[in-house]
Amino acid sequence: MVATLWPVNDRSTALLVAEFYQLLFTERQDPAAALASARGHLRDATVRELADWFERRYDDSAGTDLGAFEAAADFRSHRDPNERPYAHPVYWAGFVYSGP
């Protein structure tokens, strides 16, 4: 089970969970390793990478995921495409895995 130790940001959670499930089911990582990798991915992701991710999600939804469209636009509006907006531990450190 993946849980959080404190309330977390919706957008960063969506990114972390998507990466976690990609690693868990597609790449067949064990859950603890997948969560650790997903946390690192979120921590290190740049504004440019995040905007690209949300744009792909919007495109994959055939234009129906307006939340992804808005998120991509928000990230594109940042001045520094190399900024890491989720680098602070508050966004990723609260996620924990418990289980076999």
Model regions and ranges:
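Short acidic/histidine-rich active-site segments
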Residues: 1-11
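An often Trp-containing, charged/polar helix-loop segment at the C-terminal end
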Residues: 13-100
